[in-house]
Amino acid sequence: MAIATRTLKDTKIATGSGAAGGKVTVLVNMNDNTTADSLVVDASGLAGHANGAKLDITRIWWALVQGTADDNTGWVSLYFEGDTDVTAINLVGTGHYDGTAGKITNSVTNTGATSGDIKLSAFGTSGYVLIELRKDSAFTA
């Protein structure tokens, strides 16, 4: 019934002409988590964040097991937060997404400020999710 998130890496492109973007790596650990809408990446807290900046998912590793409940459990959903949230990917079991099929693009729209945040909903799940993200050009050096 707990979730813990840790930012392992938050880089930005070196200062200079046209310098923008960067990479972020986040580790999410869960113990029999049933929490909906857990904030796992607060984009405004990342280096170089500006209004309208978005994060795209480039790679993911995960190892998830079912918690104590027995129905429809043992999986998580990652989604991009917006006026209407957009599901990025659903994860179950153990695996990885290596990005060879391309990044998972943050396609949310907002009528107001764009947060760029990523949330996770867990369904009776224990384990971890390691997420590698790419900052778009709205992140400044």
Task: State each model region's role.
Residues 85-107:
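An anionic, turn-rich surface loop/hairpin at beta-sheet edges
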Residues 54-66:
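A short beta-strand element within beta-rich, extracytoplasmic domains
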Residues 57, 73-75, 128:
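Exposed beta-strand and adjacent loop surfaces of beta-rich binding modules
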Residues 67-91:
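Short, surface-exposed beta-strand/strand-loop-strand elements in extracellular ectodomains
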Residues 60, 126-141:
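Exposed low-complexity, polar/acidic, P/S/T/G-rich flexible segments that act as propeptides
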Residues 1-29, 141:
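Short, intrinsically disordered N-terminal pre-domain segments
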Residues 17-19, 32-52, 70, 76:
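Surface-exposed ligand/attachment interfaces on beta-rich extracellular proteins
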Residues 104-128, 136:
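Noncatalytic modules at the cell exterior or secretory-pathway interfaces
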